[in-house]
Amino acid sequence: MKLYFVRHGRTEWNQEGRFQGSSGDSPLLPTAVEELDTLGKHLAQTQFDKIYSSDLPRAVRSAEIIQEESQFPTEIVSVPELREWQLGKLEGAKISTIEAIYPHQMTAFRHNLSQFNHTFFDAESVYHTTHRTISFIKNLKDKNYEQVLIVGHGANLTASIRTMLGYDTPLLRKNGGLTNASITILETEDFENFELITWNNTDYLLEKAEN
């Protein structure tokens, strides 16, 4: 099975530099809608057996925009297992403010998750956020699907995908986080071993610019 992961489009809170997490949400920016429309055109000839999205509005809307351009319309199923990392007290806060108060924790969150202490913020642990998402993905093993599109969130998908690729916790953020409206593709035959086909790809935007 080939798994296409897309991070939702850029939102107002992304632009303002705020943590969104699993409780916070904000509308997609007009530029994000344009990017997702371009992504939809890029994927228009890809036949997905199913589209799964987080049930948070920014992810659902992103999935809908992509789907609108598809030559092979299919059902969008929104599920809580794909929600963003639950960040507790951080949700809605300005990232710059938290960086000033908890510099070491913010460095850990961005670069070495083994040093991130979720209890400081009443947030989900690394294990919990990745386990709920990976468990959902591995349950797709029993489906007779060839290609699936999964629309989710930056922090959760970055950690979950890297975990599926076999990286230990200190290395989950080594290559940085996923960009808004980026594509990451994994392929698997047994849902235990995953091969990375492409990571955090936004080349489709360059193709649009060239055209």
List each model region and its residues.
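Extreme N-terminal starter segment of soluble prokaryotic enzymes
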Residues: 1-4
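Active-site-proximal alpha-helix that buttresses catalytic centers in soluble enzyme cores
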Residues: 12-74
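Glycine-rich phosphate-binding loop signature in dinucleotide/nucleotide-binding domains
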Residues: 45-47, 140-146
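Short beta-strand scaffold positions
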Residues: 53, 131, 151-152
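Acidic, low-complexity terminal tails and accessory targeting/binding regions
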Residues: 68, 72, 87-100, 146, ...
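Phosphate-handling substructures
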Residues: 69-132, 195-198, 210-211
